[in-house]
Amino acid sequence: MPGLKGCLVAPPPWEAKLAGVFSKAVALLLPNGLLISVVRDEGGMEALALWPGAEAYARIDAAAMAGFSDARADSPGAAEAARSAAIAAIEAAYAAAEPWDPRPRLAELSRAFAAAGRDGAPAAAADRLRAALRRAEAADRHRRGGADGTDGTADDDTIRGNGPYGRAFEAMKARDDFPAALVGFGPGTTPAGDDWLAGYLCAADLTSGRGPGYAEAALRNEIVCRLDRTTAAGRSLLTGALAGVPPRYLCALVEALAEPCAGDDELVDAVESALSHGASSGRDAVDGFLSALLGLGATVEA
């Protein structure tokens, strides 16, 4: 496979600079404040991402690392040449890649979800998702050697815990501008509030029956007005979510919930994939997804 390019990535040439090299991605910063993420794995696809395939990624990663290497601090010309080589390799990978746009499939799933015609279908989906979340988190605790089955919220400094972020998140629920107030809120390169909103919009689009990008129009407008409050990674994630293009792991969650042939094991697999995304990004997005299914006032504890 020649690779994949997100549907919101404009064709090169880009007036971009290398912004960072991470364990699973190389980031390009565009003049408009958005990031193009060159991802190591196909599962990391997003609206503004490029997956070049394993061999091309290795070349891009090596060139980008050379461009940022401390060993080249005394040779800025060599570092600049390495960065230019990385960008050239990324542009070549874009040219070879196939478009990735999940919106047609998400629209089918949204219509199918609505056509199921059951009152309370979102709540039933939430029950299935909570059960899958319990199974996935129990399996994760077992892998990490936790035998007591506790969730460890006492030491959890995420938006679910009882630390500063968790307490602030609970307080924000009482605000008139919630959940738009979550833009840029919380820990992470992509702030936790942005992940939560991406999950929320994804589920709202699913349950609307109209497909991606239509639900919660007022909230979407509020988010647009607040994009300058978050990081480049957060803006990029939310730009995709606003356009109805959630990250691939959320697309898999929709597929597992709305595809009639998908069973509980497939849903657990999708949840496990989500939980593996970032330090807490996937879990934060699942929280937002559940909140859209249940209503903002409902608890999202698994």
Indicate where each model-derived feature is located.
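Phosphate/adenylate-binding glycine loop and adjacent helical scaffold
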Residues: 1-146, 152-169, 188-193, 236, ...
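Long, charge-rich alpha-helical interaction segments
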Residues: 221-225
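A long, hydrophobic alpha-helical segment
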Residues: 169-189
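Acidic, carboxylate-rich catalytic segments that either coordinate divalent cations
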Residues: 249-254, 259, 263-302
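A structural-propensity feature for long, helix-poor, extended segments
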Residues: 234, 238-254
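N-terminal loops that bind phosphate or other acidic moieties
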Residues: 121, 160-162, 166, 176-181, ...
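Conserved phosphate/anionic-ligand binding catalytic regions in large, soluble enzymes, centered on
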Residues: 189-203, 281-292
